[in-house]
């Protein structure tokens, strides 16, 4: 798997969430942001690893169907 693809997908996902939060003013993303800000650092790292594994596992298999 290409590491650059993973890097850019995480960045695009981050700015996608920021876009919805600022432009469309959806409070769901705001509450997620507050929840993430209150998490301790190890939980943020674990959540990031879980998101990365999700991107590795789900997206390649969706393309093969």
Curated annotation (Swiss-Prot):
Keywords tagged on the record: Membrane, Plasmid, Transmembrane, Transmembrane helix
Transmembrane segments: 4-24, 39-59
Main subcellular location: membrane
Organism placement in taxonomy: Bacteria, Bacillati, Bacillota, Bacilli, Lactobacillales
Membrane topology, from the record: Multi-pass membrane protein
GO annotation, cellular component aspect: membrane
Compartmental location: Membrane
Protein name, as recorded: Uncharacterized membrane protein SPD_2304
